[in-house]
């Protein structure tokens, strides 16, 4: 059974913990309690292949930003979360993706861009088109989720597994890496 390390990144209050807890336990956290660092494990079957996800739910506040390099160094897949009802959280996600590329020293890191809180449609500040355009620029999948209504939560974690599975395959067009798997 494959084990993967997934890191959930985003500003404070965007719903990183709520998404993670909803996926792992099937419950919604109503009260906001800022995270410093939480670690979860869950078995998941994606495309008939079992995997174990080790999910690191990170602090969104800037005072813990210095810890991000370590999280990123150890992560294999990244879920970048912003709140659809907070334009600033969308802007804040861009330097986080840049930090992933800088630490990993590789452009093709498995990343999913996630607009959370789709259940608050009437308060939306970030359009679907803005999210899609950024994901297209980055060459990664884009999803809109709701931890509260469980919209696309399971699909999100299944997709990051697919992205990590794909990244683990050697590049058939690159003769240097056709016989090895460098991570």
UniProtKB/Swiss-Prot annotation:
Ubiquitinated; undergoes 'Lys-63' monoubiquitination and diubiquitination by NEDD4. Multiple lysine residues are probably modified. Ubiquitination requires TNIK, prevents interaction with effectors and inactivates RAP2A. Ubiquitination by the ECS(RAB40B) complex leads to RAP2A localization to lamellipodia plasma membrane, activation, and regulation of sorting at early endosomes for recycling to the lamellipodia plasma membrane. Palmitoylated. Palmitoylation is required for association with recycling endosome membranes and activation of TNIK. SMART domains: RAB (SM00175), RAN (SM00176), RAS (SM00173), RHO (SM00174). GO terms for biological process: actin cytoskeleton organization; cellular response to xenobiotic stimulus; establishment of protein localization; microvillus assembly; negative regulation of cell migration; protein localization; protein localization to plasma membrane; Rap protein signal transduction. Keywords: Cell membrane, Cell projection, Endosome, Golgi apparatus, GTP-binding, Hydrolase, Lipoprotein, Lysosome, Membrane, Methylation, Nucleotide-binding, Palmitate, Prenylation, Ubl conjugation. One of its GO terms (cellular component) is midbody. Gene3D superfamilies: P-loop containing nucleotide triphosphate hydrolases (3.40.50.300). This is Ras-related protein Rap-2a. The gene is Rap2a.
